[in-house]
Design a protein with these regions (language model features):
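Extracytoplasmic/periplasmic copper-protein system
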Residues: 159-170
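Charged heptad-repeat coiled-coil "stalk" segments of single-pass membrane proteins
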Residues: 88-91, 101
Length: 170
């Protein structure tokens, strides 16, 4: 009986504390103020593990087709570059204004395994809540999303001139 009372007391305290935090306004949700290291760690680990689990069984097609690179480049230019940058670009108004900051996809990550491609596909298709990353799967089919994944895979190796050629609209 004492154990049940203790569990009930802890549950009431947990709900009460949660409600107090939610309704007091003490948590700063401003995008220009970073989370504490602890909160950031919790959110980042949750994000990484959620994507990894959701993307684990995605079958990756051949991403070496030049047509994929070209069509993915055009979409990247119009849909991604303002946040994830272009070769030679260090920051943009969008990359500076978003929190958490979007990853700079022009920088090599030295991680060329198939899980990265699966993760990129899943993130592009489904987006990430409360991050500014849209779910492009609502408006783009899988082939178009794979084209963006193929382009992103090559992006860190591109010069600004190569980028211009691959992202030019005909």
């Amino acid at each position: 009986m004492k154990m049940i009372k203790l569990i009930l007391l802890l549950a009431v305290l947990g709900v009460g504390t949660t409600a107090a935090v939610m309704y007091s306004g003490v948590v700063n949700v401003a995008a220009d103020e970073p989370h504490s290291d602890f909160v950031y760690w919790i959110l980042e680990e949750t994000r990484k593990n959620s994507i990894k689990k959701a993307a684990a069984n995605i079958k990756v097609p051949d991403l070496t087709d030049p047509e994929l690179l070209l069509s993915g480049g055009v979409d990247y230019e119009f849909m991604c570059a303002s946040c994830h940058l272009k070769p030679g670009q260090r920051e943009s108004d969008m990359s500076l204004g978003l929190y958490p900051a979007p990853p700079n996809l022009t920088v090599p990550d030295n991680n060329d395994d198939i899980q990265v491609e699966r993760n990129n596909f899943w993130v592009i298709k489904h987006g990430i809540k409360a991050s500014g990353m849209p779910a492009w799967g609502k408006t783009h089919d899988d082939q178009r999303i794979w084209a963006m994944v193929a382009f992103i895979k090559r992006l860190p190796t591109l010069t600004p001139d190569q980028y211009q050629v691959l992202t030019a609209v005909e």
